[in-house]
């Protein structure tokens, strides 16, 4: 049979259960322009609804009347490379998401279209006859009447509004099949490309000078011409601003052929570096030794992976800088990932000083327009070094040679929404595709990463000492049980109070860490014990002193606090101090001493992380109180004291990673102290001072912690000695959720058998969130294709089976909670 050109297309509307590359005919006008990586509009499903799609591959196939044609090409050039297309398909298989979910993670939000579906009355439609053919079907008549009432063109959302709670899809499908209605799609870009107009002379210089003499009665036109005669070419807006001339004067000169206007792409950017790049500082002998080893891996013909363990303040960033310079010299690009948005300003400032305008920044805190334009600069090869948070791992860097993940143990590198990917896994795939070097850096490496280094899967490098032989902070463990026995029930121990007093006397700065925002975690009645709980979630409401509101940090529900208990009228007690309460306590303990609070609420008021950090550094504010965002990467030379206010908070949470998270948090925040010339100190407040993890963190002895933790993991069969695969079920009815979970558990036990330990159903730590109950079945196994296929099959089955229609099911690889 006749072979025709076809395209394999990932379709936006496809759910996970039906997601696959769909085959579409390529119309003759598109055969020369359509390529993989271009977006298209295609008819999809029974109603041929216009839908956006991405071309994954081109092929030939036998002509089949059932094949639908592509209706429109949206991109004149591919917006996605073949490597990133392969990445999207791999993510579909690896993270249990649709291909389009992966594409939405890979591409910036500004590149997407808003696609609207419009139903139109067919040309020459006999409305009366069509309504008669609708018969007794009220839905068909309503759909047709709604389209006619809108003048024969009605957007789908208007039709859905007319139908209320009912779905108009079946009625619309029938009307389209009967050729009473046609379907159209409209597209509008979320962010448009910005163009800048430039003005230049359209005539020779001598002729322009003659025009100046002839136009003495038009002073604004003369001013424009004189400026262009001097500088040759400039932004049209700046020319008008500099000369004071209105746009009408510029327009008149253009219409008369004296001035020419052309346009160039303009990049909206978060950071502009105008100075000359500085030389990178010289490495110490220890850093030089590490750099030499990593440089050899960078030059290797195949993909390589390495773990760099360096204590806080050992100068890992300087090694990164030299490695990136080496990659650039070889004509390669580089990506540096940081765990928090708060770290990007410091990194960007440092990297721009050494690499100039070739540095781009990507993170979710940027406006859509700036993210989109930074992505365009990277794709065009104008930016070869990318610094950003988790999503920057998808940056379309040309000739990627180096990908660095700083503080690689951080949970923020794992996405908790679809697609549920870990940046480290994506980085491994990309480095394999580019034959690049993946470098993981940390003062407290992930236990799994350290095990891979020990067993030879990663190369291993160490920086065991601080830069310039600076000492690690001296650490004191404060026993909060003893403080209670001594009559101190406050959040600041006598030990920490004395150290803060000493720092204030010296004019040095202090940082206090508490991973709980708000003022009080629980508000309870001293008489009857009633507590304020969220009506939508199974958690207590947190009291915020600034606005005197009780707020749920999961769903956003808020309400005013009552003057007394609403149940019995008793006195209310505020328990479980947060950052707001600590700030108030500090003002009471040290009257007149300025403090700065850095948590999500304070940042929302200040506008950006950067504004608060700059204020802390510039004004030398004596004390900063903050949540997890202050624990890593920040470098303030005048900070000589760190206080960890509740070291037990993350230690007893029933997760196999609890010890690791606690050790990492304490070690990282202690490392903010003593990074300048003055020695550092730290105070760890705990109710369990004999706990081995806390004592190891106080000694900052990662090797001892790793040895004890890996023994425990091996005994329990937890990662790295297995992998975790979780299938989560959520729904409004708890019994329906548990019933579905039980079915999934039984399915795994029958299909996988001895290859996995199957646990559950078990409630999540917050079992009800936004009025939906959440339970989980967990597998501890060595993941194989068969295990993953079984997980994908059960997710697809449960999301399409009518008996489970009231629940939502998804799978997650190594979940955080």
Model region roles, listed by residue range:
Residues 275-295, 301-738, 754, 765-767, ...:
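Inter-lobe coupling/hinge segments of SF2-like helicase ATPases
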